[in-house]
A protein has these predicted regions:
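Strongly charged, low-complexity linkers/loops
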Residues: 137-143, 147-149
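N-terminal strand-loop-strand beta-hairpin
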Residues: 1-135, 174-198
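A generic structural motif
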Residues: 146-148, 153-158
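Hydrophobic, well-ordered secondary-structure segments
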Residues: 110, 149-150, 161, 165
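Long, well-ordered alpha-helical scaffolding segments within enzyme catalytic domains
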Residues: 158-176
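Intrinsically disordered, low-complexity regions of eukaryotic proteins
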Residues: 6, 141, 153-155
């Protein structure tokens, strides 16, 4: 079971990429994602909290995957992704699971989810690049709300959240260390629930 940390960068994407390149990181992947969030249609918005929303939800994903040879040509992928997260009361993600199913197109995927009893809530778009230094993959996400997020997943050597936190601190890059579990959908959910004061 994999886990991850996601932190907010406190600099521009270009500055962040330059810092990583200077530290020996190289671009290994590039893709854009348009995620549409679905939850069980029987869930009432007034009964949802931020943490229990993330316990179980489904994404309808349109991925623009760039060819690794040049990162210019691309092809489209479509997926339904089922996600579960075990979240502590303070918002830390204890563990999580993800199950992907490739589909042929978004229209039919939406029809299937609605037929299975899900309702559509909102869509979030992001541009993502992954950099690798021979040891770790660092994913940089440029989210439509302006956030620049960095994601680091557990692997054989970095197999705990504490090790991930230490690794990203050791890189000495400009990040907000007040939250290691930033959720890109959090602002949208708070808007839905009427909790956003930003």
């Amino acid at each position: 079971m994999k886990n991850e940390i996601t932190v907010r960068a406190i600099c521009s994407k270009n500055k962040l990429i330059n810092i990583l390149k200077n530290k020996g990181f190289n671009l290994i992947d590039k893709f854009n994602v348009k995620d549409t969030y679905f939850i069980n249609k029987n869930k009432k918005l007034d009964e949802i909290t931020l943490n229990n929303f993330f316990k179980e939800y489904v994404l309808l994903r349109h991925i623009k995957q760039y060819e690794k040879s040049s990162f210019e040509d691309y092809y489209d992928e479509f997926k339904i992704t089922y996600k579960t997260k075990n979240i502590a009361s303070n918002g830390d993600i204890i563990n999580q699971n993800k199950y992907d199913c490739k589909i042929f197109n978004i229209i039919d995927g939406r029809k299937i989810l609605i037929a299975l009893g899900y309702k559509e809530l909102f869509t979030i778009s992001e541009e993502a690049v992954i950099y690798y230094n021979g040891k770790i993959n660092l994913e940089i996400k440029s989210v439509e709300n302006g956030d620049i997020l960095l994601e680091l997943e557990t692997n054989k050597k970095l197999d705990t959240i504490d090790k991930l936190k230490q690794e990203i601190r050791n890189l000495d890059i400009p990040i907000d260390e007040s939250d290691f579990f930033v959720k890109k959908a959090e602002r949208k959910i708070k808007d839905l629930l009427g909790e956003n004061n930003d």
